[in-house]
From Swiss-Prot:
Assigned protein family: Belongs to the paxB family.
Encoding gene, per UniProt annotation: prhH
Keyword Transmembrane recorded: yes
One GO term (biological process): terpenoid biosynthetic process
Protein name: Terpene cyclase prhH
Record's function text: Terpene cyclase; part of the gene cluster that mediates the biosynthesis of paraherquonin, a meroterpenoid with a unique, highly congested hexacyclic molecular architecture. The first step of the pathway is the synthesis of 3,5-dimethylorsellinic acid (DMOA) by the polyketide synthase prhL.
Regions crossing the membrane: 17-37, 51-71, 76-96, 113-133, 138-158, 170-190, 205-225
Length: 245
């Protein structure tokens, strides 16, 4: 019988492959938390949302379902999903505060921002619950989280392209997301090989498509961000010269 993966067990045998997977889980947990805190800071500093409406509402819906409705199926994260729920709630509050600056060109949306965010969050929450009812909470936890990660990475790219500037974004937000995603994928591969946490979903071609796509988005992001920064610099200098004249 395998020894439970406690902190003491990890220190006794730090090179055990499952112990390494636990360390990767901690890296992912801390990384995502830093990502959310970074979004709060950047959104407040730049007075513009740091995350799109779809990934934010999907994340909150997923976290609510598995933190409060099916907590047993996120128990291997030892309460981290609840921490993420509260951190994302802070992201939502700041986003609602600064969203009018980003929705100024959409009068209808500008007038109903709070309703839109609440409605989309409820829809994603209902969808996550329906997915859990359809395929079971164990697989639903993984596949629902996969959708969250896909939206987070893809919408980060889309946000840069649609805005044409880097306000609301930062290397810290990207790095925390990328390292957490990569660590999480390696952890899942290890646990799949050892049949831990019920992860049969990794033998799915769709799962590998999702993994490759998300990693590709995260790998491309810093290059796009850097290109945007280079385009912004001359424009900012020109604006500064005009103000000083």
């Amino acid at each position: 019988m395998e020894e439970p993966l406690t902190v003491a067990a990890i220190f006794r045998d730090p090179f055990n492959i499952l112990a390494i997977s636990e360390v990767l889980k901690v890296v992912a947990a801390v990384g995502w938390s830093v990502n959310y805190i970074g979004m709060v800071h950047r959104a407040w500093k730049d007075q513009i949302p740091s995350i799109g409406i779809l990934p934010l509402c999907c994340d909150i819906g997923w976290e609510f379902v598995y933190a409060w409705m099916f907590p047993d199926f996120s128990s291997h994260w030892q309460g981290v999903v609840r921490v993420w729920f509260f951190l994302h709630s802070a992201v939502l509050l700041v986003t609602l505060k600064v969203s009018p600056n980003d929705w100024v060109h959409t009068p209808l949306g500008h007038r109903h921002i709070v309703f839109i965010y609440i409605f989309v969050t409820l829809v994603f929450g209902a969808g996550q619950y329906a997915l859990a009812a359809e395929i079971g909470p164990a697989l639903g936890f993984h596949w629902g989280g996969a959708l969250c990660q896909f939206l987070s990475s893809s919408c980060g790219i889309a946000q840069l392209l649609s805005r044409g500037h880097t306000r609301g974004a930062s290397y810290l937000i990207w790095f925390a997301r990328a390292i957490s995603t990569f660590a999480g994928f390696i952890k899942l591969c290890i646990r799949f090989q050892h049949n831990v946490d019920g992860a049969p979903w990794l033998d799915s071609p769709m799962c590998w498509f999702y993994i490759v796509t998300v990693l590709s988005f995260d790998a491309a992001y810093p290059f796009l961000y850097s290109s945007m920064r280079k385009l912004e610099t001359p424009a900012l200098r020109k604006e500064s010269r005009i103000k000083n004249q």
